[in-house]
Amino acid sequence: IQSTSMDQGSLSEDSMNSFIRTLIQAGIWKNKVPKQTARDKDGMQTTVKKAKAESDVIANQDITLGFQPIVSVNAELLRQQRRFSSPRVLLSENTPLEPPPLYLMEEPMVLNRTSRRKRSTEGKSHRGEYSVCDSESRWVTDKTSAVDIRGHQVTVLGEIRMGPS
């Protein structure tokens, strides 16, 4: 399931609680004891469940470390919950082909629809893009030397004679 963004204020607490209850009833949040494969005397693979005490110790360590297991949600369960569909959230079984567009994050009208849009003389901002060379604004006191476009120090001529000499 991929979600691009979420408007958390749009869901009521009761609807979230009922959704969580549905997930629990579907058996998604049940703690399943992991299986371990072992070989018996004949070399055949057998599945062995870990001891309950060991899994309780691991679960207690996970809680103290703040670890939350990754939960897999069946897409059919989400289709049944139509009231949770939102134009701001995209639920899909497939991973997105490209990241979300950044220009939507820069537009003030998209972020806050109640605010008025300011006029911008520069156009759209290009965050993360820099020019090839940075400009410097300072007074030139020495007019006899300069730096050319290749970065070499050159001497500036005071006079340029043109024509036959």
Swiss-Prot record:
Q: Which InterPro entries match?
A: Cystine-knot_cytokine (IPR029034), Nerve_growth_factor-like (IPR020408), Nerve_growth_factor-rel (IPR002072), NTF3_N (IPR045815)
> Which Gene3D superfamilies did the record assign?
Cystine-knot cytokines
Chief localisation class: secreted
The intrachain disulfides are: none
Keyword annotations from UniProtKB, A to Z: Cleavage on pair of basic residues, Glycoprotein, Growth factor, Secreted, Signal
The answer on whether this UniProt entry bears the keyword Glycoprotein reads yes
From which residue to which does the signal peptide run? 1-3
Subcellular locations according to the entry: Secreted
**GO BP field:** cell surface receptor protein tyrosine kinase signaling pathway; modulation of chemical synaptic transmission; negative regulation of neuron apoptotic process; nerve development; nerve growth factor signaling pathway; neuron projection morphogenesis
Provide the residue ranges of the propeptide in this protein.
4-119
In the UniProt record, which residues carry a glycan? 112
Task: Identify a single GO molecular function assigned to this protein.
Answer: growth factor activity
According to the UniProt record, one GO cellular component term is: synaptic vesicle
Job description of the protein: Seems to promote the survival of visceral and proprioceptive sensory neurons.
Name the protein family.
Belongs to the NGF-beta family.
**Know the name of this protein?**
Neurotrophin-3
Q: Which gene encodes it?
A: NTF3
